[in-house]
């Protein structure tokens, strides 16, 4: 029984070490790396490095089968993420190039920043080997995933002789955060498609939700960050001509603007004047032969920004806000 107790104790200690919430301290840089997809600038040599990812599947808890490195730098205006995904170049699966497309059939990495360290919400960023990028808002500990959100950031990736690598530059102004705190929640994920392998930092359980935030690690040392005045202005102007029968053509000009002001880290005011919906993606046409209304996902940016704060209750698991077509 003493031997059994010792084995049990060692197992518990081992599992607690694997599933603990580790910390990594971000490194400030006075020189920004060039975002070209190659993680070869000298500044990356001083970056904070995460290289211990653990499989969620297929072999839960075991180290990732392919060497992987996530590197973190920051300055006063941006946070930078470098990625090195070592692999056989012939085995890399990378088909997509466009933004915000599904990379479910590609190799890819994902980074989640829980900027308020609440263990429930976060900003999700994705990068594929050929440079396809995607982003989303996470709420309700991964149950709410709003991929219609488009942040202001950029990412590049390249396939190399040793695998593939990439770089992200994310301005602080694209994310809300508490300036009085120097710590964010952080989760790093790599998918190796041909092996059906998912690996994360920190380690997570097989039963964890796909975008779960509560099992995150911590990114510390984030000081001296600038959010600016927190004011975003998005003006627009459209022009054309209008001609009526038996009348000369007359010019037509239409003006409008959306404005967003971040009063506090958790309070934002939105104002719209003569809202422009011309750039909004058109809903797919559907023929409705029933007596029930059709529901379409909300795609207008003005109504999407901050919408996750109004998602709760029975409908809290829905992926998108819905508007109704009568």
Role assignments for model-derived ranges:
Residues 20-326:
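Structural preference for beta-rich elements and adjacent junctions enriched in aromatics
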Residues 5-14:
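Bacterial N-terminal signal peptides
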Residues 1-3:
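Positively charged n-region of N-terminal signal peptides that target proteins for export
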């Amino acid at each position: 029984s003493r031997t059994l107790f010792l084995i049990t104790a060692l197992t518990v200690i081992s599992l607690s070490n694997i599933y603990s919430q580790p910390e990594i301290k971000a490194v400030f840089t006075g020189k920004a790396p060039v975002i070209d997809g190659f993680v070869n600038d000298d500044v990356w040599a001083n970056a904070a490095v995460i290289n211990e990812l653990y499989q969620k599947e297929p072999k839960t808890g075991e180290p990732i089968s392919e060497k992987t490195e996530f590197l973190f730098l920051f300055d006063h205006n941006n946070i930078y993420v470098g990625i090195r995904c070592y692999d056989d170049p012939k085995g890399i699966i990378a088909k997509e190039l466009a933004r915000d497309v599904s990379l479910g059939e590609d190799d890819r990495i994902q980074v989640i920043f829980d900027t308020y360290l609440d263990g429930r919400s976060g900003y999700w960023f994705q990068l594929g080997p050929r440079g396809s990028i995607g982003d989303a808002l996470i709420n309700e500990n991964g149950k709410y995933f709003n991929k219609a959100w488009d942040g202001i950031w950029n990412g590049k990736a390249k396939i190399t002789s040793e695998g593939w690598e990439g770089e992200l530059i994310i301005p602080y102004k694209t994310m809300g955060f508490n300036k009085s705190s120097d710590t964010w929640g952080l989760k790093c994920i790599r998918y190796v498609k041909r092996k059906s392998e998912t690996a994360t930092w920190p380690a997570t359980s097989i039963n964890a939700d796909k975008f779960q935030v509560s099992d995150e690690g911590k990114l510390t040392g984030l000081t001296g960050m600038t959010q600016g005045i927190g004011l975003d202005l998005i003006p627009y102007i459209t022009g054309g001509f209008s001609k009526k029968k038996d009348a000369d053509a007359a010019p037509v000009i239409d003006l409008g603007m959306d404005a967003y002001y971040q009063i506090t880290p958790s309070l934002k005011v939105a104002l719209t004047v003569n809202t422009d919906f011309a750039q909004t993606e058109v809903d797919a046409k559907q023929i409705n032969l029933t007596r029930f209304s059709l529901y379409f996902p909300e795609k207008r940016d003005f109504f999407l920004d901050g919408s996750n704060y109004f998602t709760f209750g029975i409908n809290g698991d829905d992926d998108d806000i819905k508007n109704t077509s009568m």
